[in-house]
């Protein structure tokens, strides 16, 4: 998205509404990259493993819903045009993850969390509030959030059996992308959050993971 393009408040509202619909409606997010799972064979999974992996992928899908909302909220209140553009571009990249996770959840015979609209609204508000404080805080929040996501992905990869190469391929590529997003945010001047703040974010993230594993 061009940094020199100017939008009216109504334009921005419509763009935000479009983003919310693309994030929350089933099959509405179109990935720019094909899923890494496409080239991987189907592995034989027990019924118990299938349910567990579906729960983990549902958590990851909701995490991507939160990331979309966070970026969109921040882009709405970012002060510098280049920061706003960076947020919008990052949100577009996260669409890939959103679509990949949903595809895999459906393949495992399950569905995304019904709590997604709630978490979208909460994350959008947090992102907008961070942007109102300062661009540096906003970028720092991105870095800290992506660091938390990487930890969750590592935990999930440790639980997913090697036989499920499709799910593992998705999460491995997501981890690469999320780590890059964190590095980009810090390189752009993001504030490095202190450990107590990160701990608080981690505790809040546990609320999301516990609630969306099954519903």
Swiss-Prot record:
Q: Which reaction does it catalyse?
A: a 5-methoxy-2-methyl-3-(all-trans-polyprenyl)benzene-1,4-diol + AH2 + O2 = a 3-demethylubiquinol + A + H2O
EC number(s) from the headed UniProt entry: 1.14.99.60
Q: What class of enzyme is it?
A: oxidoreductase
Q: Which UniProt keywords apply?
A: Cell membrane, Iron, Membrane, Metal-binding, Monooxygenase, Oxidoreductase, Ubiquinone biosynthesis
An example GO CC term for this entry is: membrane
Which example biological process does GO assign this protein?
Answer: ubiquinone biosynthetic process
Q: Which purpose does this protein serve, as stated in its record?
A: Catalyzes the hydroxylation of 2-nonaprenyl-3-methyl-6-methoxy-1,4-benzoquinol during ubiquinone biosynthesis.
The protein's name in its UniProt record: 3-demethoxyubiquinol 3-hydroxylase
Which organism does this record belong to?
Pseudomonas aeruginosa (strain ATCC 15692 / DSM 22644 / CIP 104116 / JCM 14847 / LMG 12228 / 1C / PRS 101 / PAO1)
């Amino acid at each position: 998205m061009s940094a020199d393009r100017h939008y009216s408040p109504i334009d921005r509202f419509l763009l935000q509404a479009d983003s919310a619909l693309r994030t929350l409606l089933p099959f509405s997010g179109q990935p720019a990259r094909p899923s890494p799972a496409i080239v991987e064979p189907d592995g034989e999974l027990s019924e118990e493993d299938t349910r567990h992996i579906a729960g983990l992928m549902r958590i990851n899908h909701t995490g991507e819903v939160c990331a979309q909302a966070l970026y969109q909220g921040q882009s709405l209140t970012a002060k510098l045009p280049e920061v706003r553009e960076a947020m919008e571009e990052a949100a577009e990249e996260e669409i890939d993850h959103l679509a990949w996770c949903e595809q895999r959840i459906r393949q495992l015979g399950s569905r995304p969390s019904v709590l997604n609209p709630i978490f979208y609204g909460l994350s959008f508000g947090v992102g907008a509030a961070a942007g109102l404080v300062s661009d540096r805080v906003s970028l720092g929040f991105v870095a800290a959030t992506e660091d938390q996501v990487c930890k969750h992905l590592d935990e999930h990869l440790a639980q997913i059996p090697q036989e499920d190469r499709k799910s593992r391929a998705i999460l491995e590529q997501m981890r690469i992308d999320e780590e890059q997003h964190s590095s980009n945010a810090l390189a752009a001047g993001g504030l490095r959050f202190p450990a107590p703040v990160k701990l608080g974010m981690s505790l809040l993230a546990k609320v999301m993971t516990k609630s969306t594993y099954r519903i």
